[in-house]
Amino acid sequence: MRIDIFTLFPEMFTGVLSSSILGKASEKELVDFHVTNFRDFSESKHGTVDDTPYGGGGGMVLKPEPLFRAVEGLTGEKKPRVILMCPQGVPYHQKLAEELAQEEHLVFICGHYEGYDERIREHLVTDEISIGDYVLTGGELAAMVVIDSVVRLQPGALGNQTSAVEDSFSTGLLEYPHYTRPAEFRGWKVPDVLLSGHHANIESWRLKESLRRTKARRPDLLEKLALTDEMKKLLAELEQEKK
């Protein structure tokens, strides 16, 4: 997979793309990162990439020419997904991460200032994505979130690919609790079932705890889920435990 990032602050990505899972994925040549300062594509001798909005108002607006020149110069006739990070975009979720992970080439545009010239949205971008109902200084941090969630889904990116499958949201449920040594710490004990070596019982416990946690913290996820007979049985047990 190739990932291109267009930003006015390329230095923000240096540590992120060379560390942890992203750095290892790059070393394994599972992903090829390219970070470009789109100010370099300004025709102004001062590198201007923004201007005042028509009709008045506060703030500055990113001009279309530098971004069109930068992105089209890279992609040519190819049509990769060009993603604009902005609070007006569709809410980001795991299913979208899985969809983007299937692409061979992704382009991210990270903006600043008041906003983008609307022609960028209409004629250059294929996707607008938001990571939440709040405003950040720019799109860089949001792009990092999306890139991390996509790259970790690439085969070979994680030491144990099962981790990606079992993560919260991948199954439609929040993830079950994890424990490691020691078996007892300050009087708090690891559940006996996890020490039993009985794999079927362990899997049942994990599913039940995922359901318990999802029901308590994100009941909306259960409403969207096609429940199996086993899930229905375990949910009934959870209801009985309340009585």
Curated annotation (Swiss-Prot):
Top-level lineage group: Bacteria
Binding site for S-adenosyl-L-methionine: G111, I131, G132, D133, Y134, V135, L136
Keywords assigned by UniProt, alphabetized: Cytoplasm, Methyltransferase, S-adenosyl-L-methionine, Transferase, tRNA processing
Enzyme Commission no: 2.1.1.228
GO molecular function: tRNA (guanine(37)-N1)-methyltransferase activity
SUPFAM superfamilies: alpha/beta knot
Annotated compartments: Cytoplasm
Family from the record: Belongs to the RNA methyltransferase TrmD family.
Oligomer status and interactors: Homodimer.
Role this protein plays: Specifically methylates guanosine-37 in various tRNAs.
Protein's UniProt name: tRNA (guanine-N(1)-)-methyltransferase
